[in-house]
Amino acid sequence: MLSCDICGETVTSEPDMKAHLIVHMENEIVCPFCKLSGVSYDEMCFHIETAHFEQNTLERNFERINTVQFGTSDNKKDNTLQCGMEVNSSILSGCASNHPKNSSQCLTKDSTLKHETFYSENLTESRKFLKSREKQSGLTEVKGSIYETTYGPPECPFCGKIEEHSEDMETHVKTTHANLLDISLEDCDQPLYDCPMCGLICTNYHILQEHVDLHLEENSFCQGMDRVQCSGDLQLAHQLQQEEDRKRRSEESRQEIEEFQKLQRQYGLDNSGGYKQQQLRNMEIEVNRGRMPPSEFHRRKADMMESLAIGIDDGKTKTSGIIEALHRYYQNAATDVRQVWLSSVVDHFHSSLGDKGWGCGYRNFQMLLSSLLQNDAYDDCLKGMSVPCIPKIQSMIEDAWKEGFDPQGASQLNNRLQGTKAWIGACEVYILLTSLRVKCHIVDFHKSTGPLGTHPRLFEWILNYYSSEGEGSPKVVCTSKPPIYLQHQGHSRTVIGIEEKKNRTLCLLIFDPGCPSREMQKLLKQDVEASSLKQLRKSMGNLKHKQYQIVAVEGALSPEEKVARRQDSQVFTAEKIP
């Protein structure tokens, strides 16, 4: 079923609806002179030509004026003078069709604006009509009498007032609406005013101004609504942005906390205990797994407590005599080696259950110190010392901080090492040796100096360090130089020598605290196999970390030199190569 939007009547099909709408259209056709309605368009044309011949002549004049104003003659039949001023949908549509400049814009949604547009047009037409009647004064009385006798009293096109005679209507219009008739229409060359917003053409500037004011009022209302909507949208967008920022900050904070906790665990600063707690915990695990008898557990625990009490390493992870064994090996074998330089005597220390995963720096310091304790040149500064246990080394570093060494490094580790599993590196080894009056310095190989990320400058520096003694010596040179502390990201080792092969390639000899005693014991055999040295030899292709730092010992310090170096450590610097 289809429903008519005009009268509400329902019909069954689309053709019926079209026929129904045609009836509406015919009923809406009104004679502009006598208000006759209810006839077809052709009948209305015949009626106007016969009954209103003189008035129709005036209408044709109006159409010619409209043609001049709007530059078109396509819609002449819609420009009929609407004296009745009946504002309905069909009349408004006819008004819009008179303005081909922008017909779509003329039909605004606001009904007030439509009425003003129609009023403006009919105002102009009415002025022309009244002016023509003044010029044709000889016919005025005749026309008036014919109009009044045949079609009834005339109605004012401006206010709708009805007068009995046309002369009275003219008097009413000239007196009451004189302000609307102040423009002469003697010719068609009068100035025209285009509406800048919809294109409507007006002959009166004041009417155009009123018409534009209606546009502005409508636009102001729409803009106000837009501002309200825009303000709401901006507020919502701001709230969404704030929520997104809050979630992002929360996620970043959570990730930072997790990363910080991870770093704390990695570097032993998570308050999970130190050497003693880890040793006991790991021994208990061994007992629970059946790998250690309870009696062995108690014996080791007693030995550990005694070692911690006196601050001396119990020597259970130490392997001695390796330098001597290497000397014999290179003398009797290693035919591919042209020359080899070995450090002074040094013991190997490996990690235990108490420091596994974090104690490499402490074990390398034990190796370096074991060499210094066997060197007479350091008797004065290391008098009466033994190789300390790891907790004792932590205490010694804290004492160096208290003396004023490396305040920045102390701050990074919260001025505390005892009872933690905190890692130590080249800086801590340097300040510890300096506090003991051992002269040393740090060299930083901060980037690779060879192809494929290799460090040939590092190898050259170590070769110069060891070969500075005994130039032109035999194949095996046992120098008096202490071993070198070698640090890289995540691990540290001890360089105990360097060999030069017959093809002039260099290979470092390195003690790794991660290598257990049973492997190091293989080097003490009388007939050492070349494969046993594989764990010691490190070629240039084996050292490809981005950065390496070394701590090299150069002798003993006087008390004055120690004070000067303590002052220099306030802003820690190292020699950089390259």
From Swiss-Prot:
Top-rank taxon: Eukaryota
The annotated site for Involved in the stabilization of negative charge on the oxyanion by the formation of the oxyanion hole falls at: 487
Write out the annotated subcellular location. Answer: Cytoplasm; Nucleus
Positions carrying N6-acetyllysine: 262
Catalytic activity reported: Thiol-dependent hydrolysis of ester, thioester, amide, peptide and isopeptide bonds formed by the C-terminal Gly of ubiquitin (a 76-residue protein attached to proteins as an intracellular targeting signal)
Cite the active-site annotation.
360 (nucleophile), 491 (proton acceptor), 512
Q: Where is this region: MIU?
A: 226-248
UniProt-listed Enzyme Commission number(s): 3.4.19.12
Q: Which residue spans match zinc fingers labelled C2H2-type?
A: 2-24, 29-52, 154-177, 193-215
Query: Which keywords appear in this protein's UniProt record, sorted alphabetically?
Result: Acetylation, Cytoplasm, Hydrolase, Metal-binding, Nucleus, Repeat, Zinc, Zinc-finger
Q: Name one GO cellular component term.
A: nucleus
Could you tell me which residues belong to the region zUBD/ZHA?
A: 249-274
Tagged with keyword Iron? no
Instruction: Give the matching PROSITE patterns.
Output: ZINC_FINGER_C2H2_1, ZINC_FINGER_C2H2_2
GO MF annotations, alphabetized: cysteine-type deubiquitinase activity; zinc ion binding
Q: Which PANTHER family match?
A: ZINC FINGER PROTEIN, ZINC FINGER-CONTAINING UBIQUITIN PEPTIDASE 1
Q: According to its UniProt record, which protein family does this protein belong to?
A: Belongs to the peptidase C78 family. ZUFSP subfamily.
Q: What is known of its domains?
A: The motif interacting with ubiquitin (MIU) and ZUFSP ubiquitin-binding domain (zUBD, also called ZUFSP helical arm ZHA) are responsible for binding the distal (outgoing) ubiquitin units S1 and S2 respectively. C2H2-type zinc finger 4 is a ubiquitin-binding zinc finger (UBZ) and required for polyubiquitin binding, possibly binding the proximal ubiqutin, and for catalytic activity. C2H2-type zinc fingers 1-3 are required for localization to sites of DNA damage.
Please give the name of this protein. Zinc finger-containing ubiquitin peptidase 1
Which organism is this entry from? Macaca fascicularis (Crab-eating macaque)
Q: Which gene encodes it?
A: ZUP1
